[in-house]
Amino acid sequence: MSIFAGKTLMITGGTGSFGNAVLKRFLRTDIAEIRIFSRDEKKQDDMRHEYQAKFPDVAHKIKFYIGDVRSLESVRSAMPGTDYIFHAAALKQVPSCEFFPMEAVRTNVIGTDNVLTAAIENNVGAVICLSTDKAAYPINAMGITKAIEEKIAVAKSRNSRNTKICCTRYGNVMCSRGSVIPLWIEQIRSGNPITLTEPKMTRFIMSLEEAVDLVLFAFEHGHNGDILVQKAPACTIQTQAEAVCALFGGKKEDIKVIGIRHGEKMYETLLTKEECAKAEDMGNFYRVPADNRDLNYDKYFTKGDVKRATIEEFNSDNTYRLNLEETTAKIGALEYIQNELNGVENLAK
């Protein structure tokens, strides 16, 4: 963590699951300050009390800023002195964004533009924008707005000399706020049916710790305008539900199929065919460089030696598919799940 020594990190949307995961990773390091920028004062107050109680010796490093990424002035007021930004503020519930698409535009599109504008004005060293697999071949409002977020980030990076801007794409982050596993646990404990949308639907899965790892990899190894993804495994929704049943004593026969919700796909894509054509294989990650040609399309060719991706498209149907045993082990290893099994209260539950 030496690269963050004495630095100030801002996390937009910082009261969410990702912000909590970053805090737990960074608080006991040599980082100077972590700024939590969000619009919900109740969540900030809850977080303040939780961290003062559980991390009394280092909680002073957390500074809270009430504001909304939709307001450029709001973002600007919190920006001076910031060295790095993890931009996690977003509307991410697919059905909600289908019914209120302009709200998704205001947060995911205009909000991102505001954060990047203020960051460039203040010579912030690096901004990592958190995106989603739904931004690749998007069919729903959430995915479309996150795709535009990525386009804004890449466009801003072309003229950004002092601020590095990268995007990271995630699949489903297990046990994050608003995700399905906590809902299933609640349904099992209350004796209600375990609801899933479509048994054969596949999704990439990753832990919150892996989500933080991806952002740190982008921070350390990404170039201006890059999009980076992890080589995540996938499983069917049916397998995931059965794994949660196995861990919490649910019954397979209690699983109830309720049908695909508004805007959902049968499978998700982390890298499109077009992106795979230029993606660099970096071990556990892929890096998609920005196309930095100008509108004159001046053609030039350079000889490179990077290892290109050898797949035509990276999606949750053609990636490694976890079986029930593997899925159960991956879910069971999560800190959130261990806490739930052992009766320990989770932060930002």
Predicted regions, residues:
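N-terminal Rossmann NAD(P)H-binding glycine-rich loop of SDR-like oxidoreductase domains
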Residues: 7-29
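Conserved residues in the N-terminal Rossmann fold of short-chain dehydrogenase/reductase
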Residues: 38, 65-66, 106, 198, ...
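Hydrophobic/aromatic anchor residues within beta-strands of the central parallel beta-sheet
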Residues: 64, 104, 127, 165-168
